[in-house]
Design a protein with these regions (language model features):
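Catalytic cores of secreted/periplasmic lytic hydrolases that degrade extracellular macromolecules
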Residues: 1-168
Length: 168
């Protein structure tokens, strides 16, 4: 899916989520674009890469291959495919290729709605919610709070925000 197609298809859902939560629709689309590969890797309507909580019902989760970064070499996942030493932003880390459990949704609309609720219900994103109307500031704060393990997460999202703005 092209960035233009992604924006056309999912901006309505992002606008509904923005109206309910105040989180910028552009920020929502940027995160969805990155986490889903511009809609090319949407399994179980999971656009945002939200991991399932321990104890989640089997019907509400799915095992998906993903990449994680950590300074530790001893992390645990349901399935570890590989662990490779890497340097990211001048920091020695380990790149994990793993299978982990992620949320599953009945529809794209449900996923976009739950995306905003996720931030509101998790105290670690309190500072991000203070700047929720500014897509770059919000996404930078989300990255700083630990949403993703990739140290380049905020920079990548900032580039995607610019791409989305060109396609609205």
């Amino acid at each position: 899916m092209t960035p233009k197609d992604f924006v056309t298809a999912y901006l309505p859902f992002a606008k509904i989520a923005e109206a309910k939560t105040g989180i910028s629709a552009i920020a929502i689309l940027a995160q969805g674009a990155l986490e889903s590969g511009w809609g090319s890797a949407v399994v179980g309507n999971s656009f945002f890469g939200v991991k399932s909580l321990p104890g989640a019902l089997a019907a509400d989760k799915q095992l998906i291959t993903t990449t994680e970064y950590s300074r530790r070499q001893d992390l645990k996942f349901p399935v570890i495919l590989s662990v490779t030493p890497v340097v990211r932003n001048g920091v020695k880390m380990f790149k994990y290729s793993v299978k982990d459990y992620f949320e599953k949704y009945d529809s794209a609309a449900e996923c976009f709605e739950e995306h905003g609720n996720f931030f509101i219900q998790n105290a670690r994103y309190k500072s991000a919610l203070l700047v929720k109307s500014d897509p770059v500031k919000f996404l930078t704060a989300v990255a700083k709070a630990g949403y993703a393990t990739d140290p380049n997460y905020a920079a990548t999202l900032t580039k995607i925000v610019a791409m989305i703005n060109k396609n609205i």
